[in-house]
């Protein structure tokens, strides 16, 4: 696939100050199709207003993982805008429309957004990569000069180390990395920067050193976890509103006999 000019991709970084969570709006300028990555329930009106003002049509919400610090707006956005909820294949989300395996993805107009499975912070983490625009959305797998914790939600320090090294640090050095959080006002980093400067996962660190670092952390229990995790397993909806999950990409691949699945729902969404 040939390179697509970056100017054809609309990009907005959105912020929730209560939980220091970043959400991301991406849209194809030609088709006006949009995705929201990690939308936050409390900002439903802000995000729908932005879509309306920019005359965009939300086709997908993409989750990087089952969050423990906020409740997603994905379910409410689906109810309001008929968007499709997309998660990683290992998240356990009960009512997603698509559960993507690594190496598959979704089409956004002229752009392709690839799912890279990056477990370790949780067992179902996904990094979303738009290679044509040199962008990757790492969730909590890789933060700016840090990473997500590995002491709950089936976290595993060794898996996280290998995920970052094999699926994020193998992206081109100039790839801009956008995390799910930052607590110091930083907004973006690059693969090259994190390889060099990340004190936990930089190339100077060994796997054993990383495991030791993560094991020594004494972090407080997330204050929203008991509400957020059960709600996010339902895409943020109340139990009565949850519906059965959609087909997994593994099933679609088996049916089509292909290793790459291109999902394009056109203008009917």
Language-model segments: what does each one mean?
Residues 125-162, 166-170:
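A contiguous binding-surface segment within folded domains or other stable secondary-structure elements
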Residues 13, 25, 105-131, 135:
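Core dinuclear metal-dependent hydrolase active-site scaffold
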Residues 39, 66, 90-91, 121-122, ...:
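Active-site metal-binding loops of divalent metal-dependent hydrolases
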């Amino acid at each position: 696939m040939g390179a697509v000019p970056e100017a054809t991709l609309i990009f907005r970084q959105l912020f929730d100050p209560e939980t220091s969570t970043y959400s991301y709006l991406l849209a194809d300028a030609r088709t006006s199709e949009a995705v929201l990555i990690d939308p936050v329930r409390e900002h439903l009106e802000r995000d729908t207003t932005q879509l309306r003002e920019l005359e965009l049509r939300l086709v997908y919400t993409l989750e990087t993982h089952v969050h423990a610090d906020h409740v997603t707006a994905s379910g409410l956005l689906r109810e309001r805008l008929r968007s499709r909820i997309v998660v990683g294949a290992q998240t356990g989300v009960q009512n997603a429309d698509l559960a993507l395996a690594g190496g598959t993805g979704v089409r956004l107009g002229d752009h392709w957004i690839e799912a890279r499975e990056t477990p370790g912070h949780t067992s179902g983490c996904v990094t979303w990569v738009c290679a044509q625009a040199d962008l990757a959305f790492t969730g909590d797998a890789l933060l700016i000069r840090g990473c997500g914790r590995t002491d709950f939600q089936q976290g595993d320090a060794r898996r996280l180390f290998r995920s970052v090294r094999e699926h994020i640090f193998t992206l081109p050095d100039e790839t801009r990395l956008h995390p799910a959080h930052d607590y110091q006002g930083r907004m973006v980093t690059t693969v090259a920067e994190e390889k060099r400067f990340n004190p936990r996962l930089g190339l100077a660190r060994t796997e054993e050193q990383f495991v030791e670092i993560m094991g020594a952390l004494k972090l407080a229990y997330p204050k929203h976890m008991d509400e957020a995790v059960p709600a996010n397993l339902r895409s943020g909806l109340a139990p009565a509103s949850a519906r059965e999950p959609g087909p997994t990409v593994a099933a679609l691949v088996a049916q089509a006999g292909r290793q790459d699945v291109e999902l394009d729902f056109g203008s009917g969404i």
